[in-house]
Amino acid sequence: MLYRDPYEFLKSIPKDKCIMCLDMGEKQIGIAFSDKTQLIATAHSVYYRKNISKDLGYLNRIFKKNEAGSIVIGLPLEIDGQKSEWCKTIIKFANKMIKKYKVSTYLQDESLSTSIAAHTLKISGVSTTKSKRIDDKISACIILQRTLDKINVIK
């Protein structure tokens, strides 16, 4: 099921399972996972997209390998909260994933996560070249940590 309400998503999250997070891009997907206590997000990897079938297959494999129980996907809302065309594409992707794998999926506003990731890497002394290779997984980590903070306040 696709959730926008953190209260409803919280009810669907299996206990003692990680949460996987995706920062969707046209060419790549940043991936992060929570720990099993669902308190801390950790950047995992960047996946370079191929086609919808291969993308879904790869994401399902690492979902299982990392013992995840649910998914968070960053949703790039406009400043005024409206959905962009890219949001609609992401929602379609999420619905395909849900239909194929029956996984609880939460859409988290990802506003400014890429800017925050780039700034964090810059002040940490990471080169621009390396930063461009890893900023998507750092963005996924930021998006997931926002969600974890939100659901842990609710608990």
Curated annotation (Swiss-Prot):
EC class name: hydrolase
Keyword Hydrolase: yes
Protein's cellular compartments: Cytoplasm
GO BP term, pick one: rRNA 5'-end processing
Keywords: Cytoplasm, Hydrolase, Nuclease, Ribosome biogenesis
Classification via SUPFAM superfamilies: Ribonuclease H-like (SSF53098)
Cited InterPro entries: RNaseH-like_sf (IPR012337), YqgF (IPR005227), YqgF/RNaseH-like_dom (IPR006641), YqgF/RNaseH-like_dom_sf (IPR037027)
Cellular compartments per GO CC: cytosol
GO molecular function, one term: nuclease activity
Keyword Glycoprotein annotated: no
Signal peptide positions (record): none
E.C. no: 3.1.-.-
Family (UniProt): Belongs to the YqgF nuclease family.
Stated role: Could be a nuclease involved in processing of the 5'-end of pre-16S rRNA.
HAMAP family named in the record: Nuclease_YqgF (MF_00651)
Protein name, UniProt field: Putative pre-16S rRNA nuclease
Organism the protein comes from: Wolbachia sp. subsp. Brugia malayi (strain TRS)
